[in-house]
Design a protein with these regions (language model features):
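A ligand-binding cleft/hinge motif common to bilobed small-molecule-binding domains
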Residues: 70, 74, 87-95, 141-144, ...
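Flexible hinge/capping segments at coil-to-helix
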Residues: 100-102, 111-129
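Short helix-initiation/N-cap motifs at beta->coil->alpha
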Residues: 62-74, 117-118, 152-163, 198
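Extracytoplasmic small-molecule ligand-binding "clamshell" domains
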Residues: 2-87, 92-94, 225, 234
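Periplasmic-binding protein-like
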Residues: 27, 103-114, 175-220, 238-245
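Ligand-binding cleft/hinge of the Venus flytrap
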Residues: 33-39, 50-60, 99, 135-156, ...
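Short loop->beta-strand "edge-of-pocket" segments that line small-molecule binding or catalytic clefts
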Residues: 20-26, 43, 121-138, 150-151
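Ligand-binding clefts/hinges and TM-proximal coupling segments of bilobed small-molecule sensing domains
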Residues: 1-13, 137-154, 220-245
Length: 245
């Protein structure tokens, strides 16, 4: 990105008027946040993407962490973050301007031992009960697209607990997370395919048009140059997290 100092000054004025870029980070996505630094800051693909934005702008970075993506999205109008790294979804886009995705994560279902459900299409049937983490990007997709099955929403890992304890027919989740769950549930299976891919993007609150254009250009260059792929490899999430096209 070869920007004039005038344009960079406009971007800084919208994204970091105090000289600090406040980056909203969703801690619940273990593929994108894989640990903590010695200073206690989040570490992983998403924090590194945010840090690179700050470096390009020659400003300091401050990580603003959230337990769930829904909480991060809800804070878009509270002036607590300047960029937010979460899944881009239409509901969230009412208050957030998103870039195109920089990475994708498949979402699918886990079914218990003995389940008659064998495909993604089998799940959306009358009488089928799906446990899903509330406010996750894929939960928003299911809310918009499931026509016959019943959705049971719970906060975070409680969706898994309810799936096991209440005997639901399917657990919706990111494939990489379900791979860990299936090992703890003898006979359970992860269905082939996906019902959606979560599009991980960078967003900024509505009304920051110059900043939004800068972020869009940054993401496209980060993908094209191989920077996103390098981060994915560096943090050991290759094969579970993929660069978006």
């Amino acid at each position: 990105m070869d920007l004039s100092e005038e344009v960079l000054a406009q971007v800084r004025a919208e994204l970091a008027p105090t000289g600090v870029l406040r980056a909203g980070i969703n801690l619940s996505n273990f593929l994108l946040v894989t640990g903590k630094t010695d200073e206690g800051n989040p570490e992983g693909v998403s924090p590194s993407m945010a840090a690179e934005v700050a470096r390009r702008l020659s400003v300091d970075i401050q990580y603003v962490t959230f337990k769930t993506p829904g909480e991060l999205a809800d804070a878009a109008t509270d002036d607590v973050w300047d960029i937010g790294l979460i899944g881009a979804e239409p509901e969230r886009a009412r208050h957030i301007t998103f870039t195109k995705a920089y990475s994708e994560i498949e979402a699918t279902y886990l079914v218990p031992a003995g389940s008659p459900l064998n495909s993604i299409e089998d799940v959306d049937q009358p009488g089928v009960r799906i446990s899903v983490p509330a406010r996750a990007a894929f939960e928003l997709w299911l809310t918009d697209n499931i026509q016959h099955a019943e959705l049971h929403r719970a906060v975070g890992r409680q969706a898994y607990v309810d799936f096991v304890e209440q005997g639901f027919d399917a657990l919706a989740g990111l494939r990489a997370g379900l791979i860990n769950d299936v090992d703890n549930l003898p006979g359970s299976r992860i269905l082939d395919g996906k019902f959606t891919s979560v599009q991980q993007a960078i967003g900024t609150p509505k009304g920051r048009d110059v900043a939004a254009n800068f972020l869009s250009d940054f993401v496209e260059e980060a993908k094209r140059s191989g920077f996103v792929g390098e981060l994915i490899e560096h943090f050991g999430v290759s094969g579970r997290l993929t660069p978006a096209p």
